[in-house]
Structure formats: structure tokens, C-alpha cells
Amino acid sequence: MNPNYLDFEQPIADLEAKIQELRKASTGPAVNVETEVRALRDKLRVRTAQIFRDLSAWQVSQLARHPQRPYTLDYINTICDEFQELAGDRAYADDKAIVGGLGRIDGRPVVIIGHQKGRDTKTKVARNFGMPRPEGYRKALRLMKLAERFRLPLLTFIDTPGAYPGIGAEERGQSEAIARNLLEMAELKIPVICTVIGEGGSGGALAIGVGDRTLMLEYGTYSVISPEGCASILWKDAGKAKDAAEQLGLTARRLKDLSLVDKVIREPTGGAHRNPQQMGKRLKAVLLNELDALEKVPLETLLQQRYERLRSYGAYEGR
């Protein structure tokens, strides 16, 4: 699958195009072509490393939204031995912007919940562009309670621009559904690991984001609002999204420095979409290590640590 190149990746695109052209148009001895191809590939590796060594917050935001970035179901297919999806909130409908079910990772039973986006127009509409409605969050809560009932660890994958702001969603209690999940997740009597795999947009992300560990992929984002939305509010100009991205502090490294994220998981050079299998293996290894650690903690201690963790967020200056 050929990746779509972002604007700052143009030098990479140019080098890869040269390599392809050289392979197609070669008329001389193969050894000469291969020598030149190897030289170009070496140059490509160096240039790619240079570009991704110091990305701006806005560039990271673009990577987090990359159309070929792995989504929740992609990771489930990579890390799970088996998975059975469960549907519906048992009250209104099945929201396909949230997926979840029972799975096994190296034989270990878990419950997995995550946001899910689409790849093409049809699936994007079906998944509502990864923006859950109240029934999606209530489906997630149903699965959380199922996990608690059977004492199964809960893994959540966060990747949403935000909760759906439509009138129907508001009428059906969008804010209540999010608030209810925050409350219930804080009290779940099982280990909970939350991983930001792409966009972490505001309350829509937090509704499945309260847990004992918060992990984040290197090029994910996590923020109260999108850079464009922030720029529109502060400066009445969505074109200032680059400035807003820097001010929001939405990157994994920045959030790790603020102790809002526990661990940053390194992505393959160029982003997770460049090597989804490798990214899945890294994620699986980290999740298993974290599960091993959490399952050794007594339940009362786990809940107390989770409470203290939530109380530690934020900072203020007294007068």
C-alpha cells in the first residue's frame, strides 16, 4: 500500500519516485542499477530520519490523522489471537464509531474497546468519521461492565476527532454519556490500560480514556480541542492552526513531560502507517508488559492509585 505523502514529506516522495523510475527504466547492467538504487536508499534513510527527528506539533497532528494510519480494528487483527466483536448499547442502537468485544492476546483474555474510522467514503460515513454518538459510549460502558463482571483486563484504543456534536446526539444525552463513562471507569475493579493510537479529541477521547495507565503512540495527539478549532476561537482564523498546535501542547513527548501520559511508544520511521505490522508488535509487547505489572497490584491499591492519579492532573498558581 503506497502511503499518501504529507506536504513536509515531499523530499521523501521525490527520492522514492526516483528509485521507482530507476528500476523501471533500467537498461544497463543490473549491478550498476542496484548500486545506484542502494545509494538512493541510503540517502532516503538519512533524509527521512532528518525530517522526522524534529517534527512540529502541527506536523505531528497531520500524522495522527493520516488516512492510512492503523485504526483500532487493524491493531486488534495484529495483536489478538482471536476476537469476537459485540454490538449495541441494549437501549437505542449500535454505533459503529465505537468497536469492542472479547479477545485473547497470547492466550490472555481481555476486553478491547476503541474508536474506529473508515477508509473510504462509504465506511467513513458508516463509522461517522470516528465521532461516537451517545449509544457508542453506552455500548462501551456495557462492555466495561462486562469486563468487570468477568474480571477481565480492559484495553481501550483512542482515535477520534471528538464526540459527535449533532442535535440528535445532544438530545439523546451526549454529555451525560461521556460523564457517566468517566465516573464508571474511575471505579472499575479491573486493570484498565488506555492507548492513544491517533487523535485524542477532547471529551470524545476521555470517555474511554480513564485508566491505570495511559500510553500514547509517538505521533498521536491528545488535546481539549483540535488546532483548527482552537485557532477559530482564539484568533477567528482557522489558518492559524499551526500556532494553535504549538500552544496546545498536544504531542506525546509534551504530554509525557506533563505526566499526563505514562509511556510513549516509538513508531516506525515515517509513522505507524509505514509499517503497521511492526507497530502492532511493539504495541502488543508494551501492553503485555503493562498488564503483567498491573495484575500484580492488589485491587484496593490499584483503585487508590487510580484515584490519586486522577487527582494529580493539572496545576494552578495560588495568589
Curated annotation (Swiss-Prot):
It comes from Xanthomonas oryzae pv. oryzae (strain KACC10331 / KXO85). Component of the acetyl coenzyme A carboxylase (ACC) complex. First, biotin carboxylase catalyzes the carboxylation of biotin on its carrier protein (BCCP) and then the CO(2) group is transferred by the carboxyltransferase to acetyl-CoA to form malonyl-CoA. Residues 32-293 form the CoA carboxyltransferase C-terminal domain. It holds the Pfam family ACCA. It is found in: Cytoplasm. Its EC number is 2.1.3.15. Pathway: Lipid metabolism; malonyl-CoA biosynthesis; malonyl-CoA from acetyl-CoA: step 1/1. GO terms for cellular component: acetyl-CoA carboxylase complex. Its main location: cytoplasm. This is Acetyl-coenzyme A carboxylase carboxyl transferase subunit alpha. It catalyses: N(6)-carboxybiotinyl-L-lysyl-[protein] + acetyl-CoA = N(6)-biotinyl-L-lysyl-[protein] + malonyl-CoA. PROSITE patterns: COA_CT_CTER. Acetyl-CoA carboxylase is a heterohexamer composed of biotin carboxyl carrier protein (AccB), biotin carboxylase (AccC) and two subunits each of ACCase subunit alpha (AccA) and ACCase subunit beta (AccD). Keywords: ATP-binding, Cytoplasm, Fatty acid biosynthesis, Fatty acid metabolism, Lipid biosynthesis, Lipid metabolism, Nucleotide-binding, Transferase. InterPro entries: Acetyl_CoA_COase_a_su (IPR001095), ClpP/crotonase-like_dom_sf (IPR029045), COA_CT_C (IPR011763). Belongs to the AccA family. GO terms for molecular function: acetyl-CoA carboxylase activity; ATP binding; carboxyl- or carbamoyltransferase activity. Coiled coil: none annotated. GO terms for biological process: fatty acid biosynthetic process; malonyl-CoA biosynthetic process.
